[in-house]
Amino acid sequence: AFWAAGKLYALSAVPSPCVMLDTDFICWKSISNLLDGPDTAAIHREDIMPSIYPDQTAFTKTEGFPLDSFDWTVQPFNTALAYFGNDEFRRYYTDTAIRFMRCSPDADDALTYMVFAEQRLLAMCAEKKYAHAAALSDLPALFGGAQNGYFTHIWGFKQQMRENPKLYEDFCRRCAARLQKDFPEESNCLLY
């Protein structure tokens, strides 16, 4: 049920400051200027959609974890990119997420349980510990290009590319063109 558990275990072993980045997420520019100040940050907040982020009554397979000790109104973070600048908070978050997974060995809804452990708990832990948490962007900026070319997140487009080789080829060509434009010396090494 916990397909991304490896990321959380790895994060638990890496001291802050550190970044956790999904393989379908591209940072085209340095983000160090965006990370000055927060204890933790993620690419954007998520709306609380009950089908993905249900209330605590949905976690019937979780035993011994204090679900009621968290604020369920806090918007989850999308952790395709997550930053941890405060080591004490990083440890608290990873310990909490790993404890939740261990308390849910018979999780019956892989998506709900995993995004709770990885994304919703990040926001809940930050709220509970009064950690300074920041969203680096928002969905309209990511989809509309208003984030100044910092990021590409492939999301569900992966499936469309699997089903349509022309989409895949076009995406690869656009990435190659971007690499040539933004990193001419490095792209010459890669292309030849």
Residue ranges of model-derived segments:
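Active-site-proximal specificity loops/subdomain of glycosyltransferases
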Residues: 1-13
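Short glycine/proline-enriched coil/turn segments at helix->beta-strand junctions
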Residues: 13-18, 36-39
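Short beta-strand-to-loop acidic/aromatic patch adjacent to the donor-nucleotide binding site
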Residues: 16-28
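Short His-Asn-centered micro-motif
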Residues: 21-23, 43-45, 84-85
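Conserved donor-nucleotide/metal-binding helix-loop-beta segment in metal-dependent transferases, i.e.
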Residues: 27-64
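Short, P/G- and charge-enriched loop/turn segments at secondary-structure junctions
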Residues: 66-72
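Catalytic core and acceptor-binding pocket of nucleotide-sugar-dependent glycosyltransferases
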Residues: 72-162
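C-terminal catalytic/acceptor-binding lobe
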Residues: 141-192
